From Swiss-Prot:
GO terms for molecular function: magnesium ion binding; phosphopyruvate hydratase activity. GO terms for cellular component: cell surface; extracellular region; phosphopyruvate hydratase complex. Mg(2+) binds at D244, E283, D310. Pathway: Carbohydrate degradation; glycolysis; pyruvate from D-glyceraldehyde 3-phosphate: step 4/5. It comes from Chlamydia pneumoniae. It comes from the Bacteria. PANTHER family: ENOLASE. The active site is at E207 (proton donor), K335 (proton acceptor). Its EC number is 4.2.1.11. This is Enolase. It catalyses: (2R)-2-phosphoglycerate = phosphoenolpyruvate + H2O. It is an enzyme of class 4 (lyase). Keywords: Cytoplasm, Glycolysis, Lyase, Magnesium, Metal-binding, Secreted. It is found in: Cytoplasm; Secreted; Cell surface.
Length: 428
């Protein structure tokens, strides 16, 4: 192994896919190897997420600049980890967390800390001349994830009348990531044609999915079914449906209701949708505070549907352990910037997997062309990935990276058995 220590760290302000500033961090080692990371940012965020550092006292970018976070990288984090072995990921992450000193990384900013954390891993991989997935996952990193493709956007990701945030497809009948991407692209373009024929907008939302003005969530699901069929696939066999309700966005904390409905009624609505449509995954079907509701939702649908916690867990190992202990959900969405370091992200993945929960590596609505999450999905055999639609370069970059990894692996590549919660099985 080539010995290498951190020799330099540079950071600068760049723009994400929504036109807001974020960080680009570059770590250089004593051997001259370089690792880079570009940090994403979310629009729909959980209350217990690690906090970004934004220049709220400045008029630049409407108070969303990250110049102070850039300064924190250069003046605090770099001197702190300078000279550390680039392979000591957990040590470097611990030093940064200790220096920050807050439970949610608000002192220095999760965006600053994550940028250094991920760039360090890239630098280590570059020093060893290995791809990131192989450096992190070793020889067992050969499983490609089934993508969850967000084709219709609603909620906080679009300016339309849809209550739910994401209407996704899962190409469960694919035999490779290359075929899965092909299937998704076929449905995407078929859906675009259908929307155009109906005089509906084909403009896209933050995550590359269409954002038409539809009357109901059911209308969105019907359109997806029609697009799947017209593209030549069988719903529930070749391609299943998935939802991200982002229920916290329409939950009233004071009354404990969802647009006036109690959690039993909300669960009944979701259960009814699963009976009528080939839905095999529901994310954030209830609000993050509604533990009683989550327990019931998991009891009612957890045997046949993937019940995904995003805001519920925010990639936080403590919250994941609590959820496991209380029987909440059966799947964890993994977003590195929710927790703020690679070490904690990996721990969250392993905790979920050891408990028998499925895992989904996920992007954010404010993305860059950084493809780290594609490598993470393969490195830790996550099984699934959420990285948006089949449009917008910051989304497509992740699919392209996955196909590149599949080609690199050759005969060793395995496409994940994505029928863990298959619609067909639930019909038996």
């Amino acid at each position: 192994m080539f010995e290498a220590v951190i020799a330099d760290i540079q950071a600068r302000e760049i723009l994400d896919s929504r036109g807001y500033p974020t960080l680009h961090v570059k770590v250089t080692t004593s051997t001259g190897s370089v690792g880079e990371a570009r940090v994403p940012s979310g629009a729909s965020t959980g209350k217990k997420e690690a906090l970004e550092f934004r220049d709220t006292d400045s008029p630049r970018y409407q108070g969303k600049g990250v110049l102070q976070a850039v300064k924190n990288v250069k003046e605090i984090l770099f001197p702190l980890v300078k000279g550390c072995s680039v392979y000591e990921q957990s040590l470097i992450d611990s030093l940064m967390m200790d220096s920050d000193g807050s439970p949610n990384k608000e002192t220095l900013g999760a965006n600053a800390i994550l940028g250094v954390s991920l760039a360090t891993a890239h630098a280590a991989a570059a020093t060893l001349r290995r791809p990131l997935y192989r450096y992190l996952g070793g020889c067992f990193a050969c499983s490609l994830p089934c993508p969850m493709m967000n084709l219709i956007n609603g909620g906080m990701h679009a300016d339309n009348g849809l209550g739910f945030q994401e209407f996704m497809i899962r190409p469960i009948g694919a035999s490779s990531i290359k075929e899965a991407v092909n299937m998704g692209a076929d449905v995407f373009h078929t859906l675009k044609k259908l929307l155009h024929e109906r005089g509906l907008s084909t403009g896209v939302g933050d995550e590359g999915g269409f954002a038409p003005n539809l009357a109901s969530n059911e209308e969105a699901l019907e359109l997806l079914l029609l697009a799947i069929e017209k593209a030549g696939f069988t719903p529930g066999k070749d391609i299943s449906l998935a939802l991200d309700c982002a229920a916290s966005s329409f939950y009233n904390v004071k009354t404990g209701t969802y647009d006036g409905r109690h959690y039993e009624e909300q669960i009944a609505i979701l259960s009814n949708l699963c009976d009528r449509y080939p839905i095999d995954s529901i994310e954030d079907g209830l609000a993050e505070e509604d533990y009683d509701g989550w327990a019931l939702l998991t009891e009612v649908l957890g045997e046949k549907v993937q019940i995904v916690g995003d805001d519920l867990f925010v990639t936080n190992p403590e919250l994941i352990l609590e959820g496991i202990s209380n029987g909440l959900a059966n799947s964890v969405l993994i977003k590195p910037n929710q927790i703020g370091t690679l070490t904690e992200t990996v721990y969250a993945i392993k905790l979920a997997q050891m408990a028998g929960y499925t895992t989904i590596i996920s992007h954010r609505s404010g993305e860059t062309t950084d493809t780290t999450i594609a490598d993470l999905a393969v490195a830790f055999n996550a099984g699934q990935i959420k990285t948006g639609s089949l449009s917008r370069s910051e989304r497509v970059a992740k699919y392209n990276r996955l196909m590149e990894i599949e080609e690199e692996l050759g005969s060793e590549a395995i496409f994940t058995d994505s029928n863990v919660f298959s619609y067909e099985d639930s019909e038996e």
